[in-house]
Amino acid sequence: MEKMVWSRRQLLKTTAGMAAGSAFSRLAMSQMPPPEPMNDERFTFVTTTEAKPWQTAQVYKPTFTWTLLNLNVDPAKTVEDARPMQGFGGCFNELGWTSLSALSEEDRASVMHELFDPKAGARFNYCRMPIGANDFATEAYSYDETDGDFELKHFSIDHDRKTLIPFIHAAMKHQPELKLWASPWTPPGWMKRNRFYAEAKAYPGMKDNGIRPEQVGHEGEDMFIQEPRYFETYAKYFGRFIDAYRAEGIRVGMVMPQNEFNSAQNFPSCTWTPEGLAKFLHYLGPEMRRREVDVFFGTLERGNPKLLETVMMDREAAAFVKGVGVQWAGKNALPQIHREFPALVIYQSEQECGDGRNDWSYTGYCWQLMKHYFRSGASGYMYWNISTGDGGLSTWGWSQNSLVSVNRDAKTFRYNHDYYLLKHLTHFVDKGAKTLETNGTCDDALAFANPDGSMVLLLRNEQAHEQLVQVAVAGKSAVVKLPADSVATLQIRGQDRGAGVRD
């Protein structure tokens, strides 16, 4: 994460201002008359703090003369060139399924219902999956490790039948309309110049992956063999993957050619140059078009928009690119990408994954990520690990956060803070929703207009004391009370709408 640099004068001025404002806010609130509750079924308000997640809270009448913060939303003012929302979800990783498999069948079904049922909790409807192994696979593998098998006679997804396929089927049981997109972390080893699944040595304290010094890769080089025969075979490899999963009743509707193509990692990875990716798209594009599968550029994990610009300058490659997947430091390129390529759909393709502690402070950081992506035009948002064992340790020794943590010994589970943050979005914001601009003194907010006319406001209070916010949306006004250090959602429905909180 890149840090903002402050001068000492800026820091002192800002700190003093915040302290004075905070003291004034507390004094003013103590002198205000208590707000009067408003019993209007059109309003639903839910709050989450570190200690008390997902609490239905009171909405108040805007009857006093003034409030400390205000938030105004005009449903006609959308974020410029933002596409309607396409979906939310996480990534189907092997360790996600092996952790959930430690639970009883009843508990596992309860988790999947909470995550995927369209009328219940998070309502996930669009998820990611790997093509072969990723860093949360049980081991390194691809669908064809037979050296020189250009006809893909030995292609097989049998490895996935124990993990990914049942994981996805379990989700589809609750969400039959689930959409999927996929990307590889590495091609088969024999298609790479180093003939190995990884490109870096293990970091200190992590599991040795056995890579030799001459096999180490570097950013800015094509590790994939840049020859037509290999491009053609790899494109057909993608096609065989699509076909094999369709035979299992699982339809993948979009692919990206490479996860984090700039990063040489100690786990499955493959570096590409943008020029190399453009060449590959000449082959991948037609294979996917024949199957009615979209192609996005990505995933982009560097804050350099020229990486995308280079591909889009190749007209043949650009003709196949419908969107872009952005993650990690790629977020720094997002505003420029959105300005330069307004026709491209933008997904936040992998939320930054933390360190396995799943603490509340990191959830606050994830809120800032969410705010940045949606204000920059994203129409899809994907978390990374749906579930892990306690500690979130990967096969290659990296601990990461997850929505659900499983204690394998006790056979119990818990929903982590990040889950509730994401639920504040996905429980209320529907497919087809538009991201709206906001204005007022309450800037820590996001706003959406659903296709059914309902409005959804997400608000964050970072202060150590509660705050009152007066909200004005489409002629409707209300006051909400944000608990100290909290995230909240206010849903405003039209006349004769049903209750907003489903579960």
Predicted segments with their positions:
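Active-site neighborhood of glycoside hydrolase catalytic domains
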Residues: 236-240, 244-254, 261-351
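Glycan-recognition and catalytic regions of carbohydrate-active enzymes
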Residues: 406-453
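Aromatic/acidic polysaccharide-binding cleft in carbohydrate-active enzymes
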Residues: 348-420
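C-terminal beta-strand-rich structural cap/linker in extracellular carbohydrate-active enzymes
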Residues: 483-503
